[in-house]
Amino acid sequence: MGDNKNNGDSGKLLYCSFCGKSQHEVRKLIAGPSVYVCDECVELCNDIIREEIKEISPKRDSDKLPTPHELRAHLDDYVIGQDRAKKVLSVAVYNHYKRLKNSSPKDGVELGKSNILLIGPTGSGKTLLAETLARSLNVPFTMADATTLTEAGYVGEDVENIIQKLLQKCDYDVEKAQRGIVYIDEIDKISRKSDNPSITRDVSGEGVQQALLKLIEGTVAAVPPQGGRKHPQQEFLQVDTSKILFICGGAFAGLEKVIEQRAHVGSGIGFGAQVKGEKDKATISETLSQVEPGDLVKYGLIPEFIGRLPVVATLTELDEEALVQILSQPKNALTKQYSALFEMEGVELEFREDALKAIAHKAMSRKTGARGLRSIVESILLDTMYDIPSVDGVVKAVVDESVVNGESAPILIYEHNETQAASGEQ
């Protein structure tokens, strides 16, 4: 077998036996016994084989579906607290993928789709729960911000772009994308201002809810393929969103007041009125756990949209003790992440217990939940991370409460100091 670019001994023009292109239209024409194949067809065959290999491997990985107990155990490794929300999510996600696995309906019973709504304050772990679930199931995951979405035809991001992002995460593999998870954050920000239908156009509120309806419930979305602008003649990819799990999350600030009005809690007047103090703050989480669809309608979500999110899980506000645990206990805890960074420089990093409590206290006062922990730790260690690569002999850095409060810098222990300290203890 050889490659032939000339007319050959016979002087005939040679053609690819597969696509019919002549030797002048291609870079290479490879000759076999009375057969010719061009370089373009060889490349296409390689692509087909690669796609088939890609399709086979995920099926092997996804044969065994983790049970709700296994999903919950995986969430426990990465997320502190939120026990009720973990249980609700584990069951809902398990049922969703069980439905996909057994797609042929038994006795004519077709299983409905159960998308999820997460309600909880900022930094309580909504995004982390969704991300961790996707990672444990080895499925594509993408996030979208509801505040950037607008109706089609207006300046902003179309809801169909969410599916485009999901496809990008799995190299435009439609089958893989249809098993993915989409998390839409700040869903409470697209609520309408009142529970009465508005006569004015609301392109980023109720309008977005209307646009999301079909996508969340299940439709066949037409998405341009990779490099769609370069190859406009290519057909659009058809993605069935009924197989995609949508998780929507939001803080829903003020929702507890709507629930209290419905339940007539604290609505007394004069001597009969309930006065809330500091100790009653924890009851906000308890109030949110009593949320009903009618409360969400009153808040500003349209009934049709709420109907597409039948599974509702509420998350509690994290207290100081939970924040201390978040700093040190999960597999990818912040203290472990920064310890790994320091280890790369050959330095051991130690956070004392009083330092962890001080960091948690600072995050509580900022009202940012777990989300604010990283910025606090980063600011504490900034100068040390700047200096250590240029300083020789440092073996350990210690962070205590005074460092967190800005009263001192982290304690640096040098190689010779460590030896002296050890001999002094004996």
UniProtKB/Swiss-Prot annotation:
<keyword id="KW-0547">Nucleotide-binding</keyword>
<keyword id="KW-0862">Zinc</keyword>
<feature type="binding site">
    <location>
        <position position="41"/>
    </location>
    <ligand>
        <name>Zn(2+)</name>
    </ligand>
</feature>
<dbReference type="InterPro" id="IPR038366">
    <property type="entry name" value="Znf_CppX_C4_sf"/>
</dbReference>
<dbReference type="GO" id="GO:0140662">
    <property type="term" value="F:ATP-dependent protein folding chaperone"/>
</dbReference>
<dbReference type="Pfam" id="PF06689">
    <property type="entry name" value="zf-C4_ClpX"/>
</dbReference>
<feature type="binding site">
    <location>
        <position position="19"/>
    </location>
    <ligand>
        <name>Zn(2+)</name>
    </ligand>
</feature>
<dbReference type="GO" id="GO:0051301">
    <property type="term" value="P:cell division"/>
</dbReference>
<keyword id="KW-0479">Metal-binding</keyword>
<dbReference type="Pfam" id="PF10431">
    <property type="entry name" value="ClpB_D2-small"/>
</dbReference>
<feature type="binding site">
    <location>
        <position position="38"/>
    </location>
    <ligand>
        <name>Zn(2+)</name>
    </ligand>
</feature>
<dbReference type="GO" id="GO:0051603">
    <property type="term" value="P:proteolysis involved in protein catabolic process"/>
</dbReference>
<dbReference type="GO" id="GO:0051082">
    <property type="term" value="F:unfolded protein binding"/>
</dbReference>
<dbReference type="InterPro" id="IPR010603">
    <property type="entry name" value="Znf_CppX_C4"/>
</dbReference>
<comment type="similarity">
    <text>Belongs to the ClpX chaperone family.</text>
</comment>
<comment type="subunit">
    <text>Component of the ClpX-ClpP complex. Forms a hexameric ring that, in the presence of ATP, binds to fourteen ClpP subunits assembled into a disk-like structure with a central cavity, resembling the structure of eukaryotic proteasomes.</text>
</comment>
<dbReference type="GO" id="GO:0016887">
    <property type="term" value="F:ATP hydrolysis activity"/>
</dbReference>
<feature type="binding site">
    <location>
        <position position="16"/>
    </location>
    <ligand>
        <name>Zn(2+)</name>
    </ligand>
</feature>
<comment type="function">
    <text>ATP-dependent specificity component of the Clp protease. It directs the protease to specific substrates. Can perform chaperone functions in the absence of ClpP.</text>
</comment>
<dbReference type="GO" id="GO:0005524">
    <property type="term" value="F:ATP binding"/>
</dbReference>
<protein>
    <recommendedName>
        <fullName>ATP-dependent Clp protease ATP-binding subunit ClpX</fullName>
    </recommendedName>
</protein>
<dbReference type="GO" id="GO:0046983">
    <property type="term" value="F:protein dimerization activity"/>
</dbReference>
<dbReference type="InterPro" id="IPR003593">
    <property type="entry name" value="AAA+_ATPase"/>
</dbReference>
<keyword id="KW-0143">Chaperone</keyword>
<dbReference type="InterPro" id="IPR046425">
    <property type="entry name" value="ClpX_bact"/>
</dbReference>
<dbReference type="InterPro" id="IPR050052">
    <property type="entry name" value="ATP-dep_Clp_protease_ClpX"/>
</dbReference>
<dbReference type="GO" id="GO:0009376">
    <property type="term" value="C:HslUV protease complex"/>
</dbReference>
<feature type="binding site">
    <location>
        <begin position="121"/>
        <end position="128"/>
    </location>
    <ligand>
        <name>ATP</name>
    </ligand>
</feature>
<dbReference type="InterPro" id="IPR004487">
    <property type="entry name" value="Clp_protease_ATP-bd_su_ClpX"/>
</dbReference>
<dbReference type="Pfam" id="PF07724">
    <property type="entry name" value="AAA_2"/>
</dbReference>
<keyword id="KW-0067">ATP-binding</keyword>
<dbReference type="GO" id="GO:0008270">
    <property type="term" value="F:zinc ion binding"/>
</dbReference>
<dbReference type="InterPro" id="IPR019489">
    <property type="entry name" value="Clp_ATPase_C"/>
</dbReference>
<dbReference type="InterPro" id="IPR027417">
    <property type="entry name" value="P-loop_NTPase"/>
</dbReference>
<dbReference type="InterPro" id="IPR003959">
    <property type="entry name" value="ATPase_AAA_core"/>
</dbReference>
<feature type="domain" description="ClpX-type ZB">
    <location>
        <begin position="4"/>
        <end position="57"/>
    </location>
</feature>
